[in-house]
């Protein structure tokens, strides 16, 4: 039987990527980080001194340097490539983070990447996370989850992540950047950040990863058992 499609959406640092990876591994599904795709497009534009509002130029870069995914030999980490270059860590740098909302709002860039995402999800058995998976990319996904958390908590998570990576950041600056990104993502004209009408909204403030995973896994298993 073909596996179900699970859409996990939410704002920056809501825990969606961490949770989606674990859910995919538990179910034996494919995990697709759509945010990494928009980050890769932003990275390409920055590296090639391309105007971040020039959607045709960025789409051409995406065709010249196709985005692909792989895994480390020990299966510990998903790797992201543009062309033949591995960019898993560079696409997480602050310069990319602070500009990705601009690139992600470009209609042609969104169409190019959404088409690819939908193609990858056709066979089912996939967990996809992003900001418009349940509303645009997989509107007919069998399970849609929308994760939220307070700005304070999300800034704390990002702060800890950066420290672990050796990146020095100011906590208050992170809070400001996250709040600004929330505004940009939820107010853009194309695919704004919002829960699908049939999505389950889950507030992860004060809840650890295991608790969130357990909640989603139970929902998924109920659907799988009924299929």
UniProtKB/Swiss-Prot annotation:
Q: Which SUPFAM superfamilies match?
A: P-loop containing nucleoside triphosphate hydrolases (SSF52540)
Q: What is its EC number?
A: 2.7.4.25
Name the coiled-coil region(s). Answer: none
State the UniProt keywords alphabetically: ATP-binding, Cytoplasm, Kinase, Nucleotide-binding, Transferase
| Pfam families, sorted | Cytidylate_kin (PF02224)
Task: Tell me where it resides.
Answer: Cytoplasm
Give me the residues that bind ATP, please. Answer: 10-18
Q: Which GO terms describe its molecular function?
A: ATP binding; CMP kinase activity; dCMP kinase activity
The answer, when asked if Transferase is one of the entry's keywords, is yes
* Reactions the enzyme catalyzes: CMP + ATP = CDP + ADP; dCMP + ATP = dCDP + ADP
Q: Which GO terms describe its cellular component?
A: cytosol
Main subcellular location: cytoplasm
From the record, give the transmembrane residue ranges: none
Q: Does the keyword Cytoplasm apply?
A: yes
Provide one Gene Ontology biological process annotation: nucleobase-containing small molecule interconversion
| Family note | Belongs to the cytidylate kinase family. Type 1 subfamily.
Q: What name is this protein filed under?
A: Cytidylate kinase
Organism this protein belongs to:
Streptococcus mutans serotype c (strain ATCC 700610 / UA159)
């Amino acid at each position: 039987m073909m596996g179900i499609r699970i859409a996990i959406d939410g704002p920056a640092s809501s825990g969606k990527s961490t949770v989606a990876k674990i859910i995919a591994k538990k179910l034996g599904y494919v995990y697709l980080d759509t945010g990494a795709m928009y980050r890769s497009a932003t990275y390409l534009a920055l590296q090639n001194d391309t105007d971040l509002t020039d959607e045709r130029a960025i789409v051409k870069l995406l065709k010249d340097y196709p985005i692909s995914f792989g895994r480390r030999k020990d299966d510990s980490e998903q790797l992201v490539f543009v062309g033949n270059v591995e960019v898993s860590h560079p696409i997480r740098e602050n310069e990319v983070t602070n500009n990705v909302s601009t690139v992600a709002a470009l209609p042609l860039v969104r169409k190019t990447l959404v088409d690819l995402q939908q193609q990858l999800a056709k066979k089912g058995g996939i967990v996809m996370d992003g900001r418009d998976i349940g509303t645009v990319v997989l509107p007919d996904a069998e399970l849609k989850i929308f994760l939220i958390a307070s700005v304070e908590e999300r800034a704390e998570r990002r702060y800890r992540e950066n420290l672990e990576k050796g990146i020095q950041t100011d906590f208050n600056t992170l809070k400001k950047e996250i709040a600004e990104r929330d505004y940009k993502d939820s107010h853009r004209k194309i695919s704004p950040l919002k829960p699908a009408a049939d999505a389950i909204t889950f507030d992860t403030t004060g809840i650890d990863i295991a608790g969130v995973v357990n909640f989603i896994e139970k929902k998924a298993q109920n659907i799988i058992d009924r299929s």
